Amino acid sequence: QDGKLADYTLLLFEETVKAIFNKAVREELIAFNPVHSLTKVERFHAPDKHREYLTPEELTRFLNVECATENERTVQMAFGLSSMTGIRLGDMQHLRWGDIKLIDGVQTICIIQRKTKRPATIPLNDMALSFLPPREDDNPESLVFHLVKKSDNISKYVRRIKDKAGIEKDFTYHSSRHTTATLAISAGADISSVKEVL
């Protein structure tokens, strides 16, 4: 709220920048990754509170779980979209079809974030679009995801799915936001847009 980014957000940005340079090295665009030349003091550090995030492989396992109920499936798909976009659970619970607009030929989520009151404009790549459920009607006020109301119940479904996936990390729905930056390069997400919601 003071205009500064959280320590963990800065760490995720550093990891994302490092991934960009690693990709540039692999494609022989640059000779070495300049992030590796930073001293320990110059690098960002994780905050004391440990926050879990999923690797791409773990997220794939989570999303490939065969869900037993419609509520479980809805949480699974919403988690996938949050992992691609960084959208908070509170915003996902209130996301309406009218919030998804076609801008320059690209399906884009345009919302005012409930927590920060700041606007966020997030273009959706093909992977993100795959998490959207079939639209039931033409009403722009209709919810995209019919998620259960209580966050505790959503956490219950997340734990159930992750146990089925054989993932030992103790993570919650909020962990999807910590996964976003680590997926940004591999998923083709627009980093400047992701920054808006992180």
Regions found by a protein language model. Give the residues of each.
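Short basic/aromatic active-site micro-motif
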Residues: 12, 73-76, 151-152, 168-188
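Conserved tyrosine-mediated DNA breakage-rejoining catalytic core shared by Y-recombinases
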Residues: 37-43, 58, 85, 94-134
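Short, contiguous acidic/charged loop-to-helix segments that flank catalytic cores in large enzymes
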Residues: 48-51, 67-70, 111-119, 144-149, ...
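Basic, Lys/Arg- and aromatic-enriched nucleic-acid-binding interface segment
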Residues: 3-7, 11-16, 26, 30-89, ...
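Short, polar N-cap/turn motifs at the start of nucleic acid-interacting alpha helices
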Residues: 99-106, 168, 189-198
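Hydrophobic recognition helices of helix-based DNA-binding modules
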Residues: 17-25, 132-135, 184, 188
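C-terminal catalytic core of tyrosine-transesterase DNA break-rejoin enzymes
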Residues: 80, 84-91, 157-160, 164, ...
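Active-site/catalytic core of tyrosine-dependent DNA strand-transfer enzymes
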Residues: 59, 125-168
